[in-house]
C-alpha cells in the first residue's frame, strides 16, 4: 500500500527528516523544504524565542509582509466550489491545495502568506487550513517547500499585529507540542475576510469549541484492524494465567469497582470480592494491587496499584495487609515483598498529611519499602520546557552540553531506567515479587512497570508485543492521555499536562541504543508513536481510561494507530533484530551511557539531521536480509533433495546422513 506522507515531520524544519506517519491524503513522496530550495531569503535565525519580546518580531512581520507584495486570497465562499472544480479537473498543483485524507475537509485557503522559517528566512506561499492540518506550500522553489502540521500538535495560537508605512500586517505564532514553533505573516485584510486565527483556534482545539476530534471523522481503510492487537485474556494466557494462585476477575466488568481500571484484572485466587472492595476503599481512586506480569519460572510477580490512604493518623486496613501478604505467598521462592514507591520520600510524607501515604513496615512486616525518588509531573513538564528552549530554533554549540545538563531531562530519564532495572533485578535475580505505585498509579507507575516488563520479557520487544505493552500498561490501566497531552483543549497552561509517555518512549529509545539487536522495531516506529500521540488522527491515545473510550465509542468510530503500523511492518522493522527468548536486558542507567535523542528533539533543525539516510539504509538492509534468507532456504532444499536422490540411487547400500546447512542471517 502507498504510505501516506507525514505531516508530523514535514516543512522547513522537518521536510528532510523522518517521515513518521500519515498526516495528509495518500500521495506520492514530496520534496522536502530546506536550505537547498530556491533562492535564500535573509536569515532570521536571530528571531526571539516564543517567550521573548514580540516587538522585534512585529518589525520583521512588517518587513516580510511588504517584501512579499501580498496580492490577494481565496474567499471562504469560493473554497468548496473552487476545490471541487480543481479536483475534477486534476489541477490541484495550480492552486497549491493540500491533499486530503478521507473525511478531511478544507476550512480556509489564503494565498501569499509568509512563513518565517528560522533556518531559511521568509518563504511566501499558500496556507490551507483543514479540520485536521495546517498546510503551507511554496511551488516556486525547487524542490517545492511544504509545511504540513497536524492541528493536534498545536499547544497554543497567538495573534500579533502591527502597522508600518500605512500597510497593516498580522502575525500568528503557533506553539507546538512536538518541540517546534511556527510563525506566519499576512495582510490584516485577509484576516478580516477569512478569520485565519479563528479557524486555527476552532479546529486546533475542537473540544474547547464543542466539536469532536478529527479521529472521529478519519475514514481511511487499512487491511488490518489494530483494535484487535490486544486482548487481555489472551495476553494473560500467554503469561500462564490463570493458575492456582492468580485468577482473572471480572469484578470490574461494568467499571463500578474502579472506573479507571480495565474491565478485566488479575488478582489472587483466594481473595473474595467483599475483601477486594475493602482494599479498594483503602487505596487512592480504588486502584487495588493487580498483577501486571508473572515470571514463567519463579512465579515472582509485578503488581501495580495506587498509594494507601494511611493519612496523618496512620490508618490501617487489615484486608489490605492480608492482601499484600497473599501476593507474597503466591511466590514460594521468597518470603519477602518489595514495595517500590516511585515518589520522593519527602513528597510521600506530604501526601500522608493530606490523607495519602505509604506502607509502614510495622503494618506490613514482610514488606520492604523502597522510595525511588522520581519527581512529579510538574517537574517533568518544566524540564521539557527547558529542553525545548535550548533545541529550538537555534542551538548554542559552545554551551550545548551544559545547557542539556541544565534541563535535567537526561537525569530524569536515568532515574526512570534505574528504577526499572531495580524492579527487573528483584524479579529475575532475587526471585522476589514486587508492588509498584506512586500516588494514583497511572503515571510513574506505568513508566516503571512497562519498562521493567520490557527488560524481562522478550515478547514486548517485538512490534506487536510492544503494542500490547502500551495497550495494557498505559491505555487500559488508565494513564490520563487526554489530560497529560491536552487533546483538542486550548488550556495550554493546564497543570495536568506532562510528558510522562514521552519519557517512557525516550527510555525505550535509550535501551535500543544499548541493545541494537534486541528490538524488532526501529527508531521510526517510536517517533511515529509519539507523533500520533498528539496528532488526533487515530483513536489509540484518546481519552483517559477504558471506560471513557467505550462511552465515546472510540473502538468503533475511530481507527487504531496499530492498523496503520501493522499494515506496513517493513517500514518499522529493525534489520538487526535477533529474537533471543528469555533474555533479560539490564541497561546501564548512567549518564555516561545516555544521550539526548537528537533525531526526535532536534529533528526540525535541518543542520542537525544525519548526513546518511538512515531509514532508507535500514529498508535496504531488510531487503538484502530477505534475499539472503531465500537463498539459504533454497540451498537447504537443494541439499535435502540431493540427499534423498543419493539415498535412492544407492538402494540397499549403507546410508549416509546428509549434513544440514545451518546459516543464520
From Swiss-Prot:
It comes from the Eukaryota. The modification Phosphoserine is found at residues 43, 49. A 1,2-diacyl-sn-glycero-3-phospho-(1D-myo-inositol-3-phosphate) binds at residues 351, 376-377, 439-444, 484. Its main location: membrane. GO terms for molecular function: phosphatidylinositol-3,5-bisphosphate 3-phosphatase activity; phosphatidylinositol-3-phosphate phosphatase activity; protein homodimerization activity. Belongs to the protein-tyrosine phosphatase family. Non-receptor class myotubularin subfamily. Could also dephosphorylate phosphatidylinositol 3,5-bisphosphate to produce phosphatidylinositol 5-phosphate. This is Phosphatidylinositol-3-phosphate phosphatase MTMR1. It comes from Homo sapiens.
Amino acid at each position: 500500500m502507498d504510505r501516506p506522507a507525514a505531516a508530523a515531520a514535514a516543512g522547513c524544519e522537518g521536510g528532510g527528516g523522518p517521515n513518521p506517519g500519515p498526516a495528509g491524503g495518500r500521495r506520492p513522496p514530496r520534496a522536502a523544504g530546506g536550505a537547498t530550495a530556491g533562492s535564500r531569503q535573509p536569515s532570521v535565525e536571530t528571531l526571539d524565542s516564543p517567550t521573548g519580546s514580540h516587538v522585534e518580531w512585529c518589525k520583521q512581520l512588517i518587513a516580510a509582509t511588504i517584501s512579499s507584495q501580498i496580492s490577494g486570497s481565496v474567499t471562504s465562499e469560493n473554497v468548496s466550489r473552487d476545490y471541487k472544480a480543481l479536483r475534477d479537473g486534476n489541477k490541484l498543483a495550480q492552486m497549491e491545495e493540500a491533499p486530503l485524507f478521507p473525511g478531511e475537509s478544507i476550512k480556509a485557503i489564503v494565498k501569499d502568506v509568509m512563513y518565517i522559517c528560522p533556518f531559511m528566512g521568509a518563504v511566501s506561499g499558500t496556507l490551507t487550513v483543514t479540520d485536521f492540518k495546517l498546510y503551507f506550500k511554496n511551488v516556486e522553489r525547487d524542490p517545492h517547500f511544504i509545511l504540513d502540521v497536524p492541528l493536534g500538535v498545536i499547544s497554543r495560537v497567538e495573534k500579533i499585529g502591527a502597522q508600518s508605512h500605512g500597510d497593516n500586517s498580522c502575525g500568528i505564532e503557533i506553539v507546538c507540542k512536538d518541540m517546534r514553533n511556527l510563525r506566519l505573516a499576512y495582510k490584516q485584510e485577509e484576516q478580516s475576510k477569512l478569520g485565519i486565527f479563528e479557524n486555527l483556534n476552532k479546529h486546533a482545539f475542537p473540544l474547547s469549541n464543542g466539536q469532536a476530534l478529527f479521529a472521529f471523522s478519519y475514514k481511511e481503510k487499512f487491511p488490518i484492524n489494530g483494535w484487535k492487537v490486544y486482548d487481555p485474556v489472551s495476553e494473560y494466557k500467554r503469561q500462564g494465567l490463570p493458575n492456582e494462585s492468580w485468577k482473572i476477575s471480572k469484578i470490574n466488568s461494568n467499571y463500578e469497582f474502579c472506573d479507571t481500571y480495565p474491565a478485566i484484572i488479575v488478582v489472587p485466587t483466594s481473595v473474595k470480592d467483599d475483601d477486594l472492595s475493602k482494599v479498594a476503599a483503602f487505596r487512592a481512586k480504588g486502584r487495588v494491587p493487580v498483577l501486571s506480569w508473572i515470571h514463567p519460572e519463579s512465579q515472582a510477580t509485578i503488581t501495580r496499584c495506587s498509594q494507601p490512604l494511611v493519612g496523618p493518623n496512620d490508618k490501617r486496613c487489615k484486608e489490605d495487609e492480608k492482601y499484600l501478604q497473599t501476593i507474597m505467598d503466591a511466590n514460594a521462592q521468597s518470603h519477602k515483598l518489595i514495595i517500590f514507591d516511585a515518589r520522593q520520600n519527602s513528597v510521600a510524607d506530604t501526601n500522608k498529611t493530606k490523607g495519602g501515604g505509604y506502607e509502614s513496615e510495622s503494618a506490613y512486616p514482610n514488606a520492604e519499602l523502597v522510595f525511588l525518588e522520581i519527581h512529579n509531573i510538574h517537574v517533568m513538564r518544566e524540564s521539557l520546557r527547558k529542553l525545548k528552549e535550548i533545541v529550538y530554533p537555534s542551538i548554542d554549540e559552545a554551551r550545548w552540553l551544559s545547557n542539556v545538563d541544565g534541563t535535567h531531562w537526561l537525569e530524569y530519564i536515568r532515574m526512570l531506567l534505574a528504577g526499572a532495572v531495580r524492579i527487573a533485578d528483584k524479579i529475575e535475580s532475587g526471585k522476589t515479587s514486587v508492588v509498584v505505585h506512586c500516588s494514583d498509579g497511572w503515571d510513574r507507575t506505568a513508566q516503571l512497570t512497562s519498562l521493567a516488563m520490557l527488560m524481562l520479557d522478550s515478547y514486548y520487544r517485538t512490534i506487536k508485543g510492544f503494542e500490547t505493552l502500551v495497550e495494557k500498561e498505559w491505555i487500559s490501566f488508565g494513564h490520563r492521555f487526554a489530560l497529560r497531552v491536552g487533546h483538542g483543549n486550548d488550556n495550554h497552561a493546564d497543570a495536568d499536562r506532562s510528558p510522562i509517555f514521552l519519557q517512557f518512549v525516550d527510555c525505550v529509545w535509550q535501551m535500543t541504543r544499548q541493545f541494537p539487536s534486541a528490538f524488532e522495531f526501529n527508531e521510526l516506529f517510536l517517533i511515529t508513536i509519539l507523533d500520533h500521540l498528539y496528532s488526533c488522527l487515530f483513536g489509540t491515545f484518546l481519552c483517559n481510561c477504558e471506560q471513557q473510550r467505550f462511552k465515546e465509542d472510540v473502538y468503533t468510530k475511530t481507527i487504531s494507530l496499530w492498523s496503520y503500523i501493522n499494515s506496513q511492518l517493513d517500514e518499522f522493522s529493525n534489520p538487526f533484530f535477533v529474537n533471543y527468548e528469555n533474555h533479560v536486558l539490564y541497561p546501564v542507567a548512567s549518564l555516561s551511557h545516555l544521550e539526548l535523542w537528537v533525531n526526535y528533539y532536534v529533528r526540525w533543525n535541518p543542520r542537525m539531521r544525519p548526513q546518511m539516510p538512515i531509514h532508507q539504509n535500514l529498508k535496504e538492509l531488510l531487503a538484502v536480509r530477505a534475499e539472503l534468507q531465500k537463498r539459504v532456504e533454497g540451498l537447504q532444499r537443494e541439499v535435502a533433495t540431493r540427499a534423498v536422490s543419493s539415498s535412492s540411487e544407492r538402494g540397499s547400500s549403507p546410508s549416509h546422513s546428509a549434513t544440514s546447512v545451518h546459516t543464520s542471517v
